[in-house]
């Protein structure tokens, strides 16, 4: 009978006395010595159901759920996996700065502690490719069993090295949204100074005055329409989150509490920004855009935007097959829902610009680069053997993501002979 439980039952219309409770007992998976995370049998932002989306970080999974860390992210394409081919189409390295482990103090509330993750481990993916695929296979089995999209928590035991499924429950946001006859698209009508970036949640845009909240004791400061800016959120924040026009957090990934609640409320959120509470100023007017791909941008000032509506039921039948022009892999899962006959042109140079962000010449010249440029290249290519390998992998991921989004329709990619040297040993 805490505040959160009472609020939930009232919101859902449950009688307090009629709700049954139970206690489950299961083996403790030693993910404090391994890794843990959450996976969905669909893309949480677009609702695209042909992928398994996995997040992973070191230590107990509570830090991922809380949004205390920015975890690694992996996308696995279901049809390719079931063909027995390599199915990982995208990997994103998270910062993973902290992890939760067991403490020697056995007293109540003190059995775990949070410690820093060594820099060398942060720059590595928490899971290898075989483990990613194995988790995706588990997720697919669970999804088929229940016959619906699922939200699954998992852990890797650091002692025996095995992967364990800890919890599985129905996905409750995207899967319940019926495919509407009218599609909304938020579009910025201008540009401005980008103050902070992070992981975009949803595809909407919100704007208002910044309200920096250090903790729950300051939640009363948030007014209707404010942009809530904080380090991270937990279930106690939900009443005040409903007032916000947008949410911005320093920490967290796409499966953290702030992201989940933002989807339920239908508002823009940018998580894992790192320094939002330091860069943004209380009372400052900003625009929070999640309408530009995986990266969410917080712009200085109130930038006008519009909401375009397309009534799919009114689209006329035409005698020619219309193919799409797609250059940003980050938007492919969204674009595939628009009526189409595949991709007629995916320019490799656009994929490089949107998916990689490093000029191929910088990869070729590494490490013989100016100090500041060399460090920037190393930072961008962390998690890979070298910048050249990073470049090759990200090109492959970009093409694979677009192909997976539109599968089994045809996707035509315009290659570039000028990149031939990147693939040479």
Q: What is the predicted role of each segment?
A:
Residues 420-425:
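Conserved small/polar residues in nucleotide/adenosyl-binding loops
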Residues 159, 173-175, 195-227, 231-346, ...:
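Acidic, glycine-rich flexible loop/linker segments
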Residues 147-172:
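Conserved metal-phosphate-binding beta-hairpin within the catalytic cores
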Residues 1-3, 31-104, 166-196, 243-250, ...:
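Extended active-site and interfacial segments that coordinate phosphate-rich ligands
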Residues 55-151, 202-203, 389-392:
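Conserved catalytic alpha/beta cores of large enzymes that bind or transform nucleotide phosphates
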Residues 124-154, 319-336, 387-406:
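Phosphate-interacting basic helix/loop segments used at nucleotide- and nucleic-acid interfaces
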Residues 1-46, 57, 111-145, 149:
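Extended, highly charged
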Residues 354, 365-417:
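Active-site loops and adjacent core secondary-structure elements that bind or stabilize anionic groups
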